[in-house]
From Swiss-Prot:
Family: Belongs to the SchA/CurD family.
Positions of region (Disordered): 1-22
Pfam families referenced in this protein's UniProt entry, alphabetically: ABM, SchA_CurD
UniProt-listed InterPro entries: ABM_dom, Dimeric_a/b-barrel, SchA_CurD-like
Transmembrane stretches, start-end: none
Domain ABM residues, every copy: 46-137
Bias (Low complexity): 8-22
Name by which UniProt lists this protein: 42.8 kDa protein in whiE locus
Length: 397
């Protein structure tokens, strides 16, 4: 179980929404090869640690509210157990830990409307929350064998957290939306001694916006810091009339619901062997997904990127897969012209192209032919590239 954090961000929120939990039947994506720093598909169990600051005097109300919702949470697919604890030293500090079969069912739950409705009774009792999410690597329990197969090796990363937000604007307002999102004043990148906003990349396709952020340190802290910046607040307010989903940023519940529905977590990130003199270009790809095929396509792209990370000569320097429901976006840093290597840039090289045919609705973007054909891949790349609006990096990132 988890409770949504206090909503505030450059384009706030944390983590995912409803994803079909396919991990039980799909093979795990290897992560012990170099380069993979994020993977929701490695098959390991997940431990969620939620720290809560409860209003003093409302401890009993909080406990009663938890009692009312605990059975509903226990029935969520993929949920294994949870444990509610109160601090020995400070009665306002509580800890809620939960275990999940894997990341996929947790991400399907944490930012869904169902989750918000379930935990709403707790909200009035809680001043603040902070959520931490971990893959279980090893477990020791009195000599009894631990369930599941542990990952053979830890992932190695660069202390960078990646997250994305997606939303749609009313048809006919795309030009003004693009102008607002291209011209806003950059927020102060420095958050505190351990957290810094590194990069914000915005893209548009039709009336859909995708905003991807990279943070060194704590994501929630950075997003809250950014949300307080006057320039960011001004552009968020200016966007309100154009949004297809109404929101009131002055109403915490309205803001929380908007950013919950907009959250699109990074489910896989791979960095490839860097090359000096590489001509980096960043692009975002919005894949046309058949109904219900989003989870399988995200897993396929993750598997392709994990395999490609072993190739030091490929054109892709880094790739991040963002996923929610049937929305799959892949953020790719490429060395050179992307159209020189469409299969690799799309993540549909080798067997991946044939495997993707049943998952992609290429005709929806005006592309005929099989993804296994080179000409089809070239056309597909041109049609699913999102239009870049802005790509801002902080000094030293």
């Amino acid at each position: 179980m988890t409770v949504s954090p206090v909503v505030a961000t450059d384009a706030p929120s944390t983590d995912a929404t409803r994803t079909t939990a396919t991990s039980a039947t799909s093979p795990a994506v290897a992560t012990d090869a170099g380069g993979v720093s994020i993977s929701a598909f490695d098959g390991s169990r997940v431990r969620v640690v939620l720290m809560l600051d409860v209003h003093d005097g409302m401890q009993q109300e909080f406990l009663d509210a938890y009692e009312r919702i605990r059975d509903r949470v226990a029935a969520v697919p993929g949920h294994v157990s949870d444990q509610l604890c109160q601090s020995l030293e400070n009665p306002t500090q509580w800890l809620l830990t939960s275990e999940w079969e894997s990341a996929a069912p947790f991400l399907a739950w944490v930012n869904s409307d169902e989750h918000l409705d379930t935990v709403e009774p707790l909200a009035t009792c809680v001043r603040d929350t902070h959520s931490l999410r971990y893959s279980v690597l090893r477990e020791t329990d009195g000599g009894r064998p631990a369930p599941g197969e542990p990952r053979s090796a830890p992932r190695i990363g660069d202390n960078v957290v990646r997250h994305a937000l997606t939303f749609t604007v009313r048809p006919g307002t795309e030009a003004e939306t693009a102008r607002l999102l291209s011209e806003y004043v950059s927020p102060d990148a420095h958050v505190d001694g351990s957290t810094r906003l590194l990069r914000t990349s915005l893209f548009m396709s039709g009336n859909r916006i995708v905003r991807a952020v990279e943070v060194r340190g704590d994501l929630q802290t950075a997003l809250r810091h950014v949300a307080r910046q006057p320039g960011v607040r001004a552009v968020e307010e200016a966007l309100n009339p154009y949004l297809e989903q109404d929101r009131d940023l002055g109403d915490p519940q309205s803001a929380r619901r908007f950013f919950t529905r907009a959250a699109m977590p990074a489910v896989h990130h791979a960095t490839y062997p860097d090359r000096s003199g590489a001509r980096r270009e960043r692009l975002a790809l919005l894949y046309p997904v058949r109904d219900g095929a989003g989870p399988d396509l995200a897993r396929l792209l993750a598997r392709q990127d994990a395999a490609a990370a072993r190739n030091p000569d490929g054109p892709v320097l880094a790739a991040t897969v963002f996923h929610r429901d049937d929305l799959v976006v892949r953020l790719v840093d490429v060395d050179g012209d992307p159209e020189d290597a469409p299969a690799e840039v799309l993540g549909l090289h080798g067997r991946g192209a044939a495997d993707a045919e049943r998952l992609l609705d290429a005709a929806a973007v005006g592309v005929d032919g099989s993804p296994a054909e080179a000409a089809t891949l070239s056309r597909l790349l041109r049609r699913i590239r999102m239009t870049p609006l802005t790509d801002r990096r902080s000094a030293g990132s």
